[in-house]
A protein has these predicted regions:
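N-terminal beta-propeller domains
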Residues: 1-66, 116-188
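Surface loop/turn motifs at the tips and blade-to-blade linkers of beta-strand repeat domains
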Residues: 28-34, 69-74, 108-113, 153-157, ...
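Beta-sheet-dominated scaffold domains
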Residues: 86-88, 119, 161-237
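Short glycine/acidic-enriched loop and turn motifs that connect beta-strands
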Residues: 94, 133-134, 225-228
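A broadly used, surface-exposed interaction patch
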Residues: 60-89
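Hydrophobic or amphipathic alpha-helical targeting/insertion segments
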Residues: 79-111, 127-128
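A short alpha->loop->secondary-structure connector
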Residues: 100-112, 144-149, 189-196
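WD40 beta-propeller blade core
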Residues: 58, 96-97, 181, 232
Length: 237
């Protein structure tokens, strides 16, 4: 069944269902040379979209015109978050920040930056996980380019490594290879995040970029010590 999806027919029909065609697609623009590594729509300001195509970062306006903003490293998927004024790109391990008001695009070169695999935004901070570790960092308040060397914490409830962080309902879900923790903004310094007591389960994430938010829930491709390949949706913690 390629490009088809099943539709149920109400009781009384000649058959119980049929295969409906998927909506058609219209080519709007070709951005860069590809592959497309990340897409983002601004959360609070303007109607522009942003895309990482190959090693280039573009802004796309409402007429689908693309403006080159800069160059990024790596070849894999790019995790993106924005604060309303800055857009943070985690390219694993490098990271970049675009400031819309000044139209500046810079690589994060703070000497205390240890690399970013995925990123999210909560309460004025960009939070990101250090690659191949249990460590979560936050940037300085309202500045994605600056890092305090003490602004980090570790997901230590289990020995698995953190693979992704996702902000949901003003909480940060910390996905490990086989477990998941939920943290909140405890307003502590220099690292403001802390685990919520009891918000822990023994299901991790197999694929960081399978994580999606929909209907106030998080969906992801799960993994635990017994196996992997099940799609989960959270209900509470």
């Amino acid at each position: 069944m390629i490009n088809l999806f099943p539709e149920a027919i109400p009781e009384g029909g000649m058959t119980s269902g049929f295969l409906n065609r998927a909506p058609g697609l219209r080519l709007l623009a070709t951005i860069g040379t590809g592959p497309i590594r990340g897409l983002w729509t601004h959360q609070t300001a303007g109607n522009d979209a942003y895309v990482v195509s190959g090693n280039k970062f573009y802004k796309i306006d409402t007429s689908y015109n693309a403006t080159l903003l800069g160059t990024v490293s790596g070849t894999g998927p790019v995790s993106i978050a924005d604060s309303g004024t800055q857009i943070f790109l985690a390219c694993n391990p490098d990271a970049y920040v675009y400031t819309e008001s000044t139209n500046t695009f810079v690589k994060v070169t703070d000497p205390d930056f240890a690399g970013a695999a995925t990123v999210c935004y909560i309460d004025g901070y960009f939070a990101f996980n250090q690659p191949n570790s249990q460590i979560i960092w936050v940037t300085e308040l309202l500045d994605g380019t600056a890092i305090n060397p003490l602004a980090f914490g570790a997901a230590e409830s289990s020995p698995d490594q953190v693979v992704a962080v996702v902000a949901n309902n003003r909480e940060v879900w910390v996905f490990g290879q086989g477990t998941t923790e939920v943290w909140y903004d405890a307003a502590t310094t220099p690292f403001p995040l802390a685990p919520i007591q009891g918000a822990y389960n023994e299901i991790g994430c197999l694929a960081p970029f399978s994580i999606a938010k929909l209907d106030n829930s998080i969906f992801w491709l799960g993994s635990d010590p017994r196996g992997y390949g099940i799609v989960y949706r959270n209900q509470g913690y």
